[in-house]
Amino acid sequence: MNTSSVRPPTRDPAWLGRVFWSLAALVLLWPLLVATEFKPWVLLAPESLQVSGHFIGSFWPLAHGGEFLAMVARETWRTVAMATAGMTLALIVALPLTLMSTRVLSISALAGPMARGPFWLRQSVRWLLVVLRSIPELVWALVFVRVVGLGPTAGVLAIALTYGGMLGKVYGEILESGETDATQNLLRNGAGRLQAFFYGLLPASAAELTSYTVYRWECAIRSSVVLGFVGAGGLGQQMDNSMKMFNGGEVATMLLVFMALVALADRVSAWLRKGLG
């Protein structure tokens, strides 16, 4: 058989399937766009362009007074502190819940189905993690602002609860998806849950756990700025105050500082993940 005479197909053999799934996606997406009243062409209306131009024009000149920049530096540091303290509390919440919800660390499950008591305890902890991560940190911040008043304390507590639920869920999935033979051998030979965790699960999953934790810290910095708009302190609260006073120069300066802060957090996060990898 002369293979040199075989011509490649002139038409993609899978084109019909791609067209079908593209049309199906459009059919499913259209009702969602209608339900959300998505009308991007409104942005090009003369009134919208005029408002946008006036808003962007108010950003110049940038605010650069010494007293103002000192305040921005102070609130930026407070924002980083809020995110870091919130993540620390989130770890304190997540670690024990992870140990209780991870099936691999269940001694009663070694011989077969898990006993009734440990099973329901594990399920209760998993439901608690669902509740914690289902409520956005913005909602928690609104609640804590009413309880403890304005300031970073509300933001720290909000990040701690929401991120504690997220960390607990993902930590459990990472631990259960890794190599578990060493952990089960330790449990069968009389080791406790903590010993099995530190000497069995943790060494195999430490890099992935740390990488995800660093990523969540980066996300917490972004969230801490947003939480400031509901009174949780930090750079976001000062930005909200400047917007209410129609001081575009101050808003623009704080936006630039915020972008620089996020970029710095992203680089630190990437550096740490690279060092772990």
Residue map of PLM features:
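Alpha-helical membrane-interface segments at transmembrane helix boundaries
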Residues: 73-81, 122-132, 214, 218, ...
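C-terminal transmembrane helix and the adjacent membrane-cytosol boundary/short C-terminal tail
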Residues: 211, 252-277
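Glycine-rich helix-loop "coupling/hinge" segments at transmembrane-helix boundaries
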Residues: 146, 222-258, 277
